[in-house]
């Protein structure tokens, strides 16, 4: 035991034994993320976050449990709530996250896997899905985030030249009339795909997953491509491979704005 692990659950410490822990800084987002060199013979990841409503790991744990056997996602190895913190130990998927330089070097291959991966996520049957993260819920959460001052006003000012309250008001005024509901990843960007060679290994960071408008993912995917490559040169290819005709640009802008609160 050392200073960083002294408050961890005893059961977790016993499970980990003397294995090597390394802080992980890309993918598997969370307050504290560790790469576990070996857990019962295989590598794993440990996520730790406060149990407060806007940072709890509970939604991700529920998503991973529901997706087990439906999509390639990490298997849950251990969970706990202890001392005001959530703990999630899960298997490590083989490969590298989509932002890794060796993956990004093969741009067209990445875009292909990126689009096909999203198509597989959105192809899940949602009729009995217990996870909901649609627009009304997102707006309620955004309102609470604004009211509790959980978003940096400077970031909103820099990007949109307004206050968080004004941006939230704009979202209410311009809310899309309809939702095209699918199972959505919720934070579909390059670091949240794991790619092994030339194949998609799986999806990570599913804390925002649930039934939502497909544009929740499409919008962030387009933004991620723009961020990675500096422009929209791969946007048309991504949409073609995903299988979308007639992009709703207003919805793209809307969901990118909404994501400022998350």
Curated annotation (Swiss-Prot):
Which compartment or compartments is the protein found in? Cytoplasm
Cellular component terms, GO, for this chain's entry? Answer: cytoplasm
- Taxonomically, which superkingdom? Bacteria
Catalyzes what? kanamycin A + ATP = kanamycin 3'-phosphate + ADP + H(+)
Note the Gene3D superfamilies from the entry: 3.90.1200.10, Phosphorylase Kinase, domain 1 (3.30.200.20)
What coarse category fits the chief subcellular location reported for this protein? cytoplasm
Could you tell me which InterPro entries the record lists for this protein? AGP_Transferase, Aminoglycoside_PTrfase, Kan/Strep_kinase, Kinase-like_dom_sf
The similarity comment for this entry is:
Belongs to the aminoglycoside phosphotransferase family.
Indicate what this protein is called per its UniProt record.
Aminoglycoside 3'-phosphotransferase
Task: State the species of origin.
Answer: Niallia circulans (Bacillus circulans)
């Amino acid at each position: 035991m050392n200073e960083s692990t002294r408050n961890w659950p005893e059961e977790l410490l016993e499970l980990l034994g003397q294995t090597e822990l390394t802080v992980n800084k890309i993918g598997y987002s969370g307050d504290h993320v560790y790469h576990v060199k070996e857990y019962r013979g295989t590598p794993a990841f440990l996520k730790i976050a406060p149990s407060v409503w806007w940072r709890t790991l509970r939604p991700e744990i529920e998503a991973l449990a529901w997706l087990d056997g439906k999509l390639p996602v990490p298997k849950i190895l251990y969970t706990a709530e202890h001392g005001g913190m959530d703990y999630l130990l899960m298997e490590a998927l083989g490969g590298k996250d989509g932002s890794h330089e060796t993956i990004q070097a093969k741009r067209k291959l990445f875009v292909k896997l990126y689009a096909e991966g999203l198509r597989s996520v959105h192809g899940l049957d949602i009729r009995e899905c217990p996870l909901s993260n649609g627009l009304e819920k997102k707006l309620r959460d955004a309102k609470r985030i604004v009211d509790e001052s959980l978003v940096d006003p400077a970031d909103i000012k820099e990007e949109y030249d307004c206050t968080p309250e004004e941006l939230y008001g704009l979202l209410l005024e311009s809310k899309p009339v309809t939702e095209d509901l699918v199972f959505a990843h919720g934070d579909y960007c390059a670091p949240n795909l794991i790619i092994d060679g030339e194949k998609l290994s799986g999806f990570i960071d599913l804390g925002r997953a649930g039934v939502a408008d497909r544009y929740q993912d499409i919008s962030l995917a387009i933004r991620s491509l723009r961020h990675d490559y500096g422009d929209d040169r791969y946007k048309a290819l991504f949409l073609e491979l995903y299988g979308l005709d007639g992009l709703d640009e207003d919805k793209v802008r809307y969901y990118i704005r909404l994501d400022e609160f998350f």
